[in-house]
């Protein structure tokens, strides 16, 4: 896993926040979310859907791609009363 992380780091040429109003999360399967509301790192050539979370999250999720959720979908998945 460490080698993968180093490989990914070497690909990063730009760090920026993901764009849009969505809430960021890492995913493995569509119903496996974590890293919500954390900053993302993005390869310069990519759009925000190819970003990755910069902060630690659940070990099983770490290093997965960051995913943008529109606010309505986020409300459906994570009702924050």
UniProtKB/Swiss-Prot annotation:
Modification sites for Arginine amide: 62
UniProt remark on domains: The presence of a 'disulfide through disulfide knot' structurally defines this protein as a knottin.
Family per record: Belongs to the neurotoxin 28 (Litx) family.
GO CC terms, sorted: extracellular region
Propeptide: 1-16, 66-81
Tissue specificity annotation: Expressed by the venom gland.
GO molecular function, one term: calcium channel regulator activity
Disulfide pattern: 18-35, 26-40, 34-53, 42-51
Listed name of the protein: U1-sicaritoxin-Li1c
The organism's place on the tree of life at top rank: Eukaryota
Predominant localisation class: secreted
Originating species: Loxosceles intermedia (Brown spider)
Alphabetically ordered keywords of this record: Amidation, Calcium channel impairing toxin, Cleavage on pair of basic residues, Disulfide bond, Ion channel impairing toxin, Knottin, Neurotoxin, Secreted, Toxin, Voltage-gated calcium channel impairing toxin, Voltage-gated sodium channel impairing toxin
Function comment: Toxin active against insects (S.frugiperda larvae). May act on sodium (Nav) or calcium (Cav) channels.
Membrane-crossing residue ranges in chain numbering: none
Location(s) in or outside the cell: Secreted
């Amino acid at each position: 896993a460490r080698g993968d992380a180093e490989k990914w780091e070497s690909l990063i040429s730009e760090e920026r926040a993901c764009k849009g109003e969505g809430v960021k999360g890492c995913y493995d399967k569509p119903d496996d979310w974590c890293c919500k509301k954390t900053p993302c790192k993005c390869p310069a050539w990519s759009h925000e859907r190819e970003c990755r979370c910069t902060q630690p999250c659940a070990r099983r999720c770490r290093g997965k791609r960051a995913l943008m959720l529109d606010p309505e979908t986020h409300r459906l998945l994570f009702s924050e009363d």
